[in-house]
């Protein structure tokens, strides 16, 4: 058999790759598990695609609604701008009309002021003539009062001299009588005191001698009895104790009797001293009356000097009152003109304030609407940005959220620091103003003009204040 020829080499079979995994070497179970995993991933991808499709439709619908609202808002803003222009035109017309009325009122007020000034001058002349007549009558009354006062002063001086002479006579008589009675009483009571003291010394000496003798005799008897009964001391101990107690009781009774006698002597001495004090009281009363009369005399002299000073001051004040009367009448006329001018300026100021409030209110409403629209636009953009970042890069979305929170916290802290600094600046400004007001009050109190402070006060209130002063001048937060 001829030899068989060699067969050519077969080509090498390539591996099958699915999702980057070689499936040629897998078993049936592995392939089934791999197929189930692929199916689950495909289902998940399909769900995500449906979810993103729904989110895209929602965003598109939301964007269309927002654009429609934006168009409506722009149309409303145009209408409001037209209304504001119309209102401004009407306000300008009203302002011109009011200014014309103010000119007419000023002209009428000027004419009325001239008439009032002429009437006031006429009344002033009449009042001046009347005041001259009253002044003459008052001068006559004042001369009569001075004459009556002079007569009363002379009469009072004469009565005072008579009373002084009579009082000096009575005082001398009372002093002589009291001095004589005092000497008699002193001599009488000194004799009684010496006699009573001698009697008491003799009586107390006799009593003490008797007590001393009885005590010595008793001691001697006790010593004799003790020597005789020393051997039988235990048998007679109770009898001796009873005898000693009886002796002590009798001695206590004697001491009590002596103490009562001493108390009677003290009472007699106290009665004598009380009688001396009773006799001294009329003399002291007379001295008190003398001092009282002397003090009344001093008061009279002081009142007399005060009366002369008051007369001089009255003359000076009358002249000053005349000058002040003329100044007051001039100031009243000037005050009337200033009051009329102030009323006109006040009405004009109120009209301007109302106009400014209306304009400011319209501007605030427009700004609030613009701010609300910008905030809504910012919220929309933030939502779209977060959704886009969450879809494309979830990790970056978490970082962005934490970054937003951190930035928000930093901004809040900075805002709080700014508010605290503004509050401190406002407190310093308030303290500066209080110090300046106190300084100006002191200058006014001492008659120094406030223009001579030596520096220019800083009172800038153009900037917006976040803190204001409360009812008691306390710095409070302006919320």
Curated annotation (Swiss-Prot):
InterPro entries: GAS8, GAS8_dom. It holds the Pfam family GAS. One of its GO terms (molecular function) is small GTPase binding. GO terms for cellular component: Golgi apparatus; microtubule; motile cilium. Signal peptide: none annotated. It is found in: Cytoplasm, Cytoskeleton; Cytoplasm, Cytoskeleton, Flagellum basal body. It comes from the Eukaryota. Residues 28-93, 117-170, 210-347 form a coiled coil. One of its GO terms (biological process) is flagellated sperm motility. Its main location: cytoplasm. Keywords: Cell projection, Cilium, Coiled coil, Cytoplasm, Cytoskeleton, Flagellum, Microtubule. Belongs to the DRC4 family. Cytoskeletal linker which probably functions in axonemal and non-axonemal dynein regulation. May play a role in the spermatozoa motility. This is Dynein regulatory complex subunit 4. It comes from Drosophila melanogaster.
